[in-house]
């Protein structure tokens, strides 16, 4: 009974991307920076070892189970520096390596799609202007067709900061908050109760329709709760409206072969539900891990369980919350033995990421990095698998493991 579990630690990059200097960001003062030298795992470990991440936790980064699976060595091979505080003498029990991205961008959709065999080789559309970011004709059509009293924002912003700045005005006026970032996204924040969750979803569906001509990857519903700027909080009812992958992915291949694909968290949204046979909602690291365990307990033959642990990225990476990211990794690490205990000799466990989001880096955006490529199971020979030339090597390996047709991109670790 062959089953694969993919645990994707959203944004947990391992540095080393040779093209990182091509990814340029800009700060509020107009100064620019690039991603060269960014290393999510490496820098978290470094700052923990220096005592600079002691809020809510203490001391060196403690992730013995991830290290035993090869994360430390994968990071060292990717970036030439072994993560500080991790034991370099531990002999990994998994196949470990790192993969470079051939997609043109460093966003969520590009990373996930490339992992499943469909790299994004075209350019996404972006709303580049920091202020007055969206085309006026788009805004006018949204106001008219959705019968809105107007809108707020229309800028690049951090999702938490914009709630502090505009949340109270939104409550008073009923105007939705429109904002974007360096990613190919149109984000809409509305109060879950006063504006209404279903109304927000319908507004996002309309927006998805209207931004297609701009080649925008995702429209994201960002519902929040609270009564004042001091207590506004995003709820767990985020919903992403993605374009469909441009060609069939590993997930569709498994579904078409008669197998099952169980998505947990935002995976179903990222793939626009393509190739998904069961979508399980969960919010927060604990619930996501619990759901992963529960689905594995009941999964049958030829099943892929795919979980995105979004909190690493959304709660800690983008917010540049170093101690929070470290504490979340340590929590995840403590839960890993539960997953390993459920694995049978016919199962495959894959741990990876979709991009970086170094909490020590400038700005608030993703960082261009290699991702870890970790494979654990009876069918896997432990040891180094080196640099993988594309994220798609991960999907190709899973296809090979399940005896599915070869994907268009990637080389299997089993071949």
From Swiss-Prot:
Protein location: Cytoplasm
Q: Which Gene3D superfamilies match?
A: Alkaline Phosphatase, subunit A, Phosphopentomutase
Which terms in the Gene Ontology molecular function aspect does this entry carry? magnesium ion binding; manganese ion binding; phosphopentomutase activity
Q: Which residues bind Mn(2+) 2?
A: 313, 318, 366
Which keywords label this protein? Answer: Cytoplasm, Isomerase, Manganese, Metal-binding
For biological process, the GO terms are: 2-deoxyribose 1-phosphate catabolic process; 5-phosphoribose 1-diphosphate biosynthetic process; metabolic compound salvage; nucleotide metabolic process
**One cellular component term from this protein's GO annotations in UniProt:** cytosol
Please name every pair of cysteines joined by a disulfide bond in this record: none
Q: Give the E.C. number(s).
A: 5.4.2.7
Entry keyword annotation includes Cytoplasm? yes
Q: Where does Mn(2+) 1 bind?
A: 10, 354-355
Q: What cofactor does its activity depend on?
A: Mn(2+)
Membership in a protein family: Belongs to the phosphopentomutase family.
Q: Describe its function.
A: Isomerase that catalyzes the conversion of deoxy-ribose 1-phosphate (dRib-1-P) and ribose 1-phosphate (Rib-1-P) to deoxy-ribose 5-phosphate (dRib-5-P) and ribose 5-phosphate (Rib-5-P), respectively.
Q: What is this protein called?
A: Phosphopentomutase
Source organism per entry reads Psychromonas ingrahamii (strain DSM 17664 / CCUG 51855 / 37)
